[in-house]
Amino acid sequence: MKHRAKEEEEENRLVQILGGYRIAMNDRRTRSTVSVVALKRIFGCILVLVFFVGFSFSNLPLTGNFRQRLISSWQTQGLKSISGNSSAVSVRETVLFPDQAFIFLKYPQGAPLFTKNDIDCVYFSPNSPQPHLDLQPDSIDSEDHDLQIVRCPLQTRGVTVSIGIKSNGHLLPIGPTFRWDSLAYEALIDYDNTTIVFVKGLNLPPKRVMDPSQFECVYGRDFTASNLLLLARVISIGQEIVRCKTPLSILSGSQSVNSSIKVSVRGVDKPVISSVARPYRRLDHNPPSQKQHQMCVCTMLRNQARILREWVMYHAHIGVQSWFVYDNNSSDDLSSLIELLDDENFNITRHAWPWIKTQEAGFAHCALRAKDSCEWVGFIDVDEFLYFPSGLPLHDVIGNLTSNVAEVRVWCHNFGPSGLKRVPTKGVLLGYTCRMDAPERHKSIVRPEALNSTLINSVHHFHLRSGFEFVNMERNALVINHYKYQVWEVFKEKFYRRSTTYSSDWQDNENLESKDRTPGLGTEAVEPPDWSTRFCEVVDTGLRDQVVEMLSDPKTQMLPWQK
């Protein structure tokens, strides 16, 4: 009891320290207001001179996609909210990826969000306080009403990026900037009040549970101020997934207070990894005893809108009841399609997942979100379709399993271009009918509440809790048709970036013998002359015939996703 009381006292002291820090910062801002007003008058005069001097150099040419803009047109000052209130839109943080900068904008409550045409990405050279280039954002994304992700192209290393508002020329102050290769990027609080933290840069081996005593979790607002940090025990750690004991002050704090607290991890005697992860309680304290859905599906995708409608409608017909779509930086208006499907009463949700090469972490995150409503969850891609050759319904197949079975492993049949050179107009199910003879690695359908607490997975399989086991499904009962090698126009997109943590990108000259790579292809997206006839050993029209019989309109012969 004494130890518990001491723990609570230390945590309460942290809350007081953090609160005092906030008050001190507010006082400091108040004291600086007078001097800022005086400086603004001087700065205004200087700005006029800079404008005329700068104008004489404004005709210097810029190459590439960069659009020229007078330096003096961007006013480096805080932006008042769009609605005219005193609250400010701000850059909460920026994360630098290899080819893009992701700028997270924080909005006042109720303020309308910017569109892509409202803003520019504005670039600063190293050691220069003045912007020199601007570009239109690659895309803008939002899931919450008060947070927006602006994706800015990053063609030069070493630059810093902010956001310029076209309507008034205001430039948002640059927020904290972090490198993607070492970052705690996501966190949530589980049913048992532990915090799950997803961390890039630990560089741990795949599929292995590590010694948690060699790490510790760190909570705080500012990880550079060691006296304002709270340490917590690591319960488990493996891959990019860390489970932490959550401090009582975090559990008892309000959501508004906790929104400014971040969590990260450090190895013993090592610095704290930078963080943008805030431990939100996204899961219900009291999940229902009766699951709402027997069968759900999780998927992670990028620019797959063209196939999503077919994938959802087919799986709805065979018994899938809910879809969790993790959008990994799509630019093909996927969100609009998901809204349309939702309006058509498909229980589908989109979750913005901007983090690259984190599919294992994303699936673990999805398993946590799905376990309160789904008895079973399948982890498959949108070019993978569950197929029941015997005609036995999905709910009978999984409903007849014993209670100690927590994972169903399903073989995959890989289909090739099937002689096609253009995208099939009636969809993949009718278009691709020729496949490889030998089946390939499994994909899994799991009971999410039976997963090991480490949440370690290899995309295809999860580690299970003690007492549970997996079964291999017979291929005559259930198999996955994987339309893996489609026409070249579609297939070449796989060269952009692989989504798994431990797979090399196909443009990299490493791990060339990996099963993730395509036989006979190098590191460049160059179409082989015989591509359309490759990977064709067995003509298989089983699923196509089922689909035509079950789903085609008797009058028009059209399929639901063609209407």
Report the location of each language-model feature.
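Short, acidic, metal-binding catalytic loop of nucleotide-sugar glycosyltransferases
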Residues: 313-322
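Active-site beta-to-alpha loop of glycosyltransferases that engages the nucleotide-sugar donor
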Residues: 299-313, 329
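Short beta-strand/loop segment that forms part of the nucleotide-sugar
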Residues: 321-329, 351-352
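Beta-strand/beta-sandwich contexts
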Residues: 45-117, 176-209
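Active-site-proximal specificity loops/subdomain of glycosyltransferases
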Residues: 281-292, 296-298, 331-377, 388, ...
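Short beta-strand-to-loop acidic/aromatic patch adjacent to the donor-nucleotide binding site
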Residues: 325, 374-387, 408
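Extended low-complexity, serine/threonine- and proline-enriched intrinsically disordered segments
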Residues: 110-131, 211-224
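Catalytic-site signature of metal-activated, phosphate-bearing donor transferases
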Residues: 2-70, 79, 143-147, 151, ...
